[in-house]
């Protein structure tokens, strides 16, 4: 059997992926309407889009696909990449960004260079009134971490699929037997464990995920329920 070889992952990339998690949501207002900006994990093709545009921001360079539509929803001045942009246009655009977005990204400015460091991608979803937009954002892991840490983002939680299950042995007791003793056992023999994990009332302990959990068993309608509790967590029933 060959040894399991795990893919090496850059430490900052792993940290940024964990920080993004199932996604983040940021509320803001634009054009007198409530809006939401969501960053979500990019589960499909994560390659950098050829039509993406690099822009410099307060948190670092960001590559945006469909940048004109995205940035136009984040403020009151339509964003365009056409023509020659003069300094006054960028100043006006940044001044008319939503205050929440401006605190996060401003000043937004052209970025002529293409970063050579590794980039991580995520989906971007914007909701403004009846308008919806889905696009993509790519950035260096350190930049994404600054982006996630520079505003009051709401952490999104993904509901666990009820069909997903984890199997783990439930050890109720332990006993050491020699090979000869095991060979001498016959059907109907009663074996008493030398160390019991549960008492006769169904109280005991379970080691799960590297932690020691207080456990209590309960039987209802021919089903055995196991209640686990930990001082850092609320009760969990299975």
From Swiss-Prot:
Its main location: membrane. It is a peripheral membrane protein. The keyword Cell inner membrane applies. Residues 66-238 are annotated as: HrcQa-C. One of its GO terms (cellular component) is plasma membrane. Keywords: Cell inner membrane, Cell membrane, Membrane, Virulence. It is found in: Cell inner membrane. The keyword Repeat does not apply. It comes from the Bacteria. Component of the type III secretion system, which is required for effector protein delivery, parasitism, and pathogenicity. Probably participates in the formation of a C-ring-like assembly along with hrcQb. Interacts with hrcQb. The HrcQa-C domain interacts with the hrcQb C-terminal domain. This is Type III secretion protein hrcQa. It comes from Pseudomonas syringae pv. syringae.
